[in-house]
Amino acid sequence: MNLLTQYLKPYIGRISLGVSIKFFGSLMDLLLPWILAYIIDSVIPTKQVSAIFAWGGAMVVCSIIAVVTNIIANRMASSVARDTTGSIRHDLFEKVSYLSIPQVEEVGIPSLVSRLTTDTYNIHQTVGMIQRMGIRAPILLLGGIMITATLDPVLTLVLVGVLPFTLVAAVTISKRGIPLFASLQKQVDVLVRTVRENVTGARVIKALSKADYEKKRFDHVKQDVVAAETTANRTMAATPPLMDLFLNIGLTLVIVVSAFRVNQGLTQPGVIIAFLTYFTIILNAMLSITRIFVIVSKGLASADRIQSVLRLPQNMQVIEAPVKEESAHIVFEKVSFTYPNGTRVLKDIDFSLQPGETLGIIGATGSGKSTIVKLLLRLYDPTKGMIRIAGRDIRSIVPTELHQLFGVVLQKDVLFAETIEENIAFGRRFSKEQIEEAAARAQAKEFINQLPKRLAHPLHTKGSNLSGGQKQRVLLSRALAGDPEILILDDSASALDYRTDAQLRKVLRQQFQQTTTVLIAQRISSIQHADKILVLENGQMNGFGSHQKLLAENAIYQAIYQGQTGGADDAEEKNGKTKG
């Protein structure tokens, strides 16, 4: 509820005006039965046609005013609901954008998607319903009771005697319903995750003929959602029938008592007709209140889920740290890293790079190659040790300043459903010439010029209308476009043919001599010209040095080299040395 209160404050003026209009319209609705009773009991017996038409005209005017004011108030309620939800969705998206990677993993991407869509929709429904019916229903309920008390206090007592039972039932059931809707949203998160996995993994699923397996898995998740929704709705579904039961009992009692009082001459027929009309108004108001309880139950559960994300602390704090005087550009000083789940990935990684040097990183799958990049980008903080850039602890650098130093192509990087030009620029202000130059450097210009719209060619989500090599070259263009101080290429040439890969490495050597480069590759040919090569095994440094040094001294590097070249080049190199 704190979330709704906080975001509704800016619109308190508009809400107050809407409530006032709604209040006035509800009063017009309440006047209609009273006027009808007056016409039947007081005007018709006088047989004055003009008076009958006058009071009938008053009923028409009241009806028109009620309709117009309700329309205006409902439109204002919709605008407040729209703007409130828009503000919540904006702030939630902004918060999600700045969450650290560990926080994103803790909450879960499907859960974040669900909170940005389903939960914000539930809040939209809640805010709108509270303004439309949350104001009108109580006014009709209380106003109806007050007017009936002036018409016939005895009948009003019969009516009021039934209402506490309906209120107790509604409140009791709603208290049980809110936790159930929270549980339902968790199941929806699982459903979103399953759908997301199936959509993103469609090619793999089809290639392995696992469509039937995935269908069964989806059906299982769907059944869990249905079960959770059934439990929640079954609980809340008891509210309307109970309301009907209590109010119909009250209606029966009112009719019985009314008949007795009319026969005794204690009340008039017009009063009874008006009273039954008010009873119907009160009945509908109570039913509306029960519907409000259902909507509000969902809304409060969703508000709690959204608030839990908005309240997440900034766990990647910028600290104060002295600048160390050193010539090295990048320094890893005894860096170790363990994931929050306890899985140790890196241990005692220790190396330094001079400005303009190139570091190649190689190792088996799961050895921690990509984790080094994640730590350098400060997507995670080391569990132990320190990382410095130009003598500055990266934890002391503001994230926006830190990330501007890098040009990055990650292992599982993403292209967006925009044009090639927009994907390369990625929100940065580059001229078309700069973008074309970046594409040429990344060996992408040739295939881009063959496309119908060239740089304006629209891409599908994740660049699915490009080949693997084309996607990598567009990603490389994005990384090279800003002339970065540090270039990180994580397995960025795996889909390139050897000729293109060689041309790319030539460009990097000739045009990015002042750029410190970190290359992660599966092929030794992609990193053998690096100034330094880091060999990782099970998260630890197994070797560090030049290609020639590692080829002579490091068993793992030798095994990788021989596995990729068949040892032919090694034999030639050794023969050459023997002849010399």
Which role fits each region the language model picked out?
Residues 23-31, 64-71, 123-126, 130-142, ...:
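Hydrophobic alpha-helical transmembrane bundles that constitute the permease/transmembrane domains
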Residues 10-12, 77, 101-102, 118-127, ...:
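An intracellular "coupling" helix at the cytosolic face of ABC transporter transmembrane type-1 domains
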Residues 325-580:
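ABC-type nucleotide-binding domain
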Residues 46, 82, 90-114, 118-120, ...:
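Short intracellular "coupling" helices and adjacent cytoplasmic loop segments at the cytosolic face
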Residues 10, 14-27, 62-68, 129-184, ...:
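Transmembrane helices of ABC transporter permease
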Residues 1-29, 36, 44-60, 69, ...:
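Membrane-integrated ABC transporters
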Residues 47-51, 147-161, 231-304, 309-310:
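Helix-loop-helix
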